[in-house]
Amino acid sequence: MTWRSEHIWIDLISGSRKKSNFCWAFLLFLGSLGFVLVGTSSYLGRNLISSFPPQQITFFPQGLVMSFYGIAGLFISCYLWCTILWNVGSGYDLFDRKEGIVRIFRWGFPGKSRRIVLRFLMKDIQSDRTEVKEGVSARRVPYMEIRGQGAIPLIRTDENFTTRREIEQKAAELAYFLRVPIEVF
């Protein structure tokens, strides 16, 4: 979501609370829970899953391996749910032409550096750069080239833009607002 006025431009970044992340975390939790239940039922010799008799899988090695994969999947699912809960990666990009300041804010993982804030002056912006790579794993990333700090990515590639035209349009609008040249690679 973008909000603009004559002197201020604010881009809100959604972070990890997206439908796809919810789906992956939920499916991974269910699948890994199923693996743990199958491994446990093969160890106990009891039928914990009604559609699956425990005699079909021996505990060593199949049940043990399924339990291991299930526990690993539960850890990964827990990690995904924590990133969703903490909304890692969300934040905003603020461009204030009146004050001459750019502020990029993102939420990180809990700890000392939970709040990630980058501040710099607009006069230090050299250009608005867009990197476009076509192919199987296509990437479209807008960067801001800062004097002394290099290129800073503005948004994640999977967030808002689906076509090359959309990202180039957004980069052109931002370059016009900031009054800097635009580069497309």
Swiss-Prot record:
Q: What name does the UniProt record give this protein?
A: Photosystem I assembly protein Ycf4
Q: Give any Gene Ontology cellular component.
A: chloroplast thylakoid membrane
Keyword terms, alphabetized: Chloroplast, Membrane, Photosynthesis, Plastid, Thylakoid, Transmembrane, Transmembrane helix
* Residue spans crossing the bilayer: 21-43, 63-85
Tagged with keyword Thylakoid: yes
Tell me if Transmembrane helix is a UniProt keyword of this record: yes
How this chain sits in the membrane, per its record, is:
Multi-pass membrane protein
Q: What is its main location?
A: plastid
GO BP, sorted A to Z: photosynthesis
Q: Which PANTHER family match?
A: PHOTOSYSTEM I ASSEMBLY PROTEIN YCF4, PTHR33288
